[in-house]
From Swiss-Prot:
Organism: Methanosarcina barkeri (strain Fusaro / DSM 804)
Pfam family, one: KH_6
Cited PROSITE patterns: KH_TYPE_1 (PS50084), S1 (PS50126)
Biological process terms in GO annotation: CUT catabolic process; exonucleolytic trimming to generate mature 3'-end of 5.8S rRNA from tricistronic rRNA transcript (SSU-rRNA, 5.8S rRNA, LSU-rRNA); poly(A)-dependent snoRNA 3'-end processing; RNA catabolic process; U4 snRNA 3'-end processing
Gene Ontology cellular component annotations, sorted alphabetically: cytoplasm; exosome (RNase complex)
Protein name: Exosome complex component Rrp4
Protein family according to the UniProt entry: Belongs to the RRP4 family.
Gene Ontology terms for molecular function: poly(A) binding
Alphabetized Gene3D superfamilies for the sequence: 2.40.50.100, K Homology domain, type 1 (3.30.1370.10), Nucleic acid-binding proteins (2.40.50.140)
Source organism superkingdom: Archaea
Quaternary structure and partners: Component of the archaeal exosome complex. Forms a trimer of Rrp4 and/or Csl4 subunits. The trimer associates with a hexameric ring-like arrangement composed of 3 Rrp41-Rrp42 heterodimers.
Compartment list: Cytoplasm
Span of domain KH: 136-194
S1 motif domain span: 59-128
């Protein structure tokens, strides 16, 4: 059964103590803040927005693309109305200004963490961990940031299934950028699955739906040789085994219905 679509101002509940993400309280009643999907649980009610831009928040993990190199900063496009600043002091070793283009140049992609966002929306970036995760291979697929929880799933259930069924490496940025790498036919299959998740994010039973889709598409691939459109090159990117922290999983679970 599909979930109920609500618009801003729709009454969600008359129990103000259950107000969750995407809602506001007025006169002890809960109303929808977004145009989105009603998400009802025993202890919380919320709304998953159907669309929206990425607004950076501290500790978000994102995929950034270099757009400007200055003597002390790399200015990053983070798929947001607000650019991010990755200061040279955040790099693992000391480098001179003249070396900055050699480390990261315009157009390069890298996995970063949002270090801080001030009241004026100045976004400071840092390395996700002690490693320097420049994305030298693979490709980046972009989905609406509000659909990211559906790509990851409860406790990473969806992304784990995608990795297993496509044999691809995947990293999902909270800004809607998804890095994928693998063999040509596997990458093509995964890209199709990601587009289907984005298009059907409001549907219930999505994980099972995507699993069946992948099985059917894999059968079609075996029947006819797929056209090659992607070259991954040599594997140069080594990501941590666990792509997302437990804190991120908890945030995701707040937004998703446990039956999906």
């Amino acid at each position: 059964m599909d979930k109920k679509i609500v618009i801003p101002g729709d009454l969600i509940s008359e129990n103000s103590k259950k107000a969750g993400y995407g809602t506001y309280v007025k006169n002890d009643k809960i109303y929808s803040l977004f145009c989105g999907i009603e998400n009802l649980k025993e202890d919380k009610v919320g709304v998953i927005p159907l669309a929206g831009v990425y607004i950076p928040s501290a500790n978000d993990v994102v995929i950034g693309i270099v757009i400007v190199v200055t003597p002390s900063n790399w200015i990053m496009d983070i798929a947001s109305p607000y650019d991010g600043l990755f200061h040279v002091s955040e790099y693992p070793r000391r480098i001179e200004s003249r070396e900055m283009h050699e480390v990261l140049n315009v157009g390069d992609s890298i996995i970063l963490r949002v270090k801080d966002v001030d009241n004026s929306m100045k976004v400071e970036l840092a390395l996700r961990d002690s490693s320097f995760h420049k994305l030298k291979t693979g490709q980046i697929v972009e989905v609406e940031p509000v659909k990211v929880p559906r790509v990851i799933g409860h406790g990473g259930s969806m992304i784990s299934m995608l990795k297993k069924e496509t044999n691809c490496s995947i990293f999902v940025g909270q800004n809607g950028r998804i890095w994928i790498d693998g063999k040509d036919d596997d990458v093509e299959l995964l890209s199709k699955a990601l587009r289907k998740i984005e298009a059907e994010a409001q549907r219930s039973g999505l994980t099972d739906r995507i699993y069946n889709f992948l099985k059917n598409e894999r059968s079609k691939q075996k029947e006819s040789k797929p056209a090659k459109f992607f070259k991954s090159g040599k594997k140069e990117v080594k990501l941590p085994k666990e792509d997302h922290s437990e804190e991120i999983y908890r945030k995701i679970d707040v937004l998703l219905d446990p039956n999906n």
